[in-house]
Amino acid sequence: MALTKERTASVVQQYGSGEKDTGSSSVQIALLTERIRQLTDHCKVHPKDKSSNRGLLVLVGRRRRLLRYSRRVSMGAYRSLVKSLGLRK
């Protein structure tokens, strides 16, 4: 269920300022979005897997908090991130 190292590295490279930049909010939001997409597909295939459904809700809440922080700090960066990830906001 976790992201592969290659996929994580590509997301960090795409949204981060450097290869080792895993702590910035934009990278964290992008990584959470990838995990959410994977879990969403899993929950569609296995609708009775309640623990995965709860984990999905936890990840969505974490991403929501990070998006709120990103919007508060820099509106321009927030808008470009939401547009590049294809999120509804």
From Swiss-Prot:
<dbReference type="GO" id="GO:0022627">
    <property type="term" value="C:cytosolic small ribosomal subunit"/>
</dbReference>
<keyword id="KW-0699">rRNA-binding</keyword>
<dbReference type="GO" id="GO:0019843">
    <property type="term" value="F:rRNA binding"/>
</dbReference>
<keyword id="KW-0687">Ribonucleoprotein</keyword>
<comment type="similarity">
    <text>Belongs to the universal ribosomal protein uS15 family.</text>
</comment>
<feature type="region of interest" description="Disordered">
    <location>
        <begin position="1"/>
        <end position="23"/>
    </location>
</feature>
<keyword id="KW-0694">RNA-binding</keyword>
<keyword id="KW-0689">Ribosomal protein</keyword>
<dbReference type="GO" id="GO:0006412">
    <property type="term" value="P:translation"/>
</dbReference>
<comment type="subunit">
    <text>Part of the 30S ribosomal subunit. Forms a bridge to the 50S subunit in the 70S ribosome, contacting the 23S rRNA.</text>
</comment>
<dbReference type="InterPro" id="IPR005290">
    <property type="entry name" value="Ribosomal_uS15_bac-type"/>
</dbReference>
<dbReference type="GO" id="GO:0003735">
    <property type="term" value="F:structural constituent of ribosome"/>
</dbReference>
<protein>
    <recommendedName>
        <fullName>Small ribosomal subunit protein uS15</fullName>
    </recommendedName>
</protein>
<comment type="function">
    <text>Forms an intersubunit bridge (bridge B4) with the 23S rRNA of the 50S subunit in the ribosome.</text>
</comment>
<dbReference type="InterPro" id="IPR009068">
    <property type="entry name" value="uS15_NS1_RNA-bd_sf"/>
</dbReference>
<dbReference type="Pfam" id="PF00312">
    <property type="entry name" value="Ribosomal_S15"/>
</dbReference>
<dbReference type="InterPro" id="IPR000589">
    <property type="entry name" value="Ribosomal_uS15"/>
</dbReference>
<comment type="function">
    <text>One of the primary rRNA binding proteins, it binds directly to 16S rRNA where it helps nucleate assembly of the platform of the 30S subunit by binding and bridging several RNA helices of the 16S rRNA.</text>
</comment>
